[in-house]
């Protein structure tokens, strides 16, 4: 087994633009998105709120889940967010405690 991994969703606002990603270091990666340190989609569309994440024992498993979820339609992703986080609260402070 390799290092742990995470699948996560960033959003611009409730029901706004969403971005799905995977990483081995969730706090670092979310910080990069929040501060606009990563050029690309999240910076362009202002996806700075961590609204959903899931931990995996292995980064490869997280990446496989990310790829599956990227093929999901938007409604399925929104349902996933709302099951864990119905108010679309920013979960940043939960991961940096």
What are these regions (language model features)?
Residues 1-39, 43-55, 60-70, 84-97:
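GIY-YIG nuclease catalytic motif and its immediate N-terminal context
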Residues 75-82:
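A short, polar/charged loop-to-alpha-helix boundary motif
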């Amino acid at each position: 087994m390799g290092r742990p991994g995470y699948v996560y969703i960033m959003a611009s606002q409730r029901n706004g633009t969403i971005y799905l990603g995977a990483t081995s270091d969730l706090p670092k990666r979310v910080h990069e998105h929040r501060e606009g340190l990563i050029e690309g989609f999240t910076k362009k569309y202002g996806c700075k709120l961590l609204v959903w994440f899931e931990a995996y024992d292995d980064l490869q498993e997280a990446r496989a889940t990310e790829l599956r979820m990227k093929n999901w339609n938007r409604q399925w992703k929104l349902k996933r967010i709302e099951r864990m986080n119905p108010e679309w609260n920013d979960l940043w402070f939960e991961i940096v405690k």
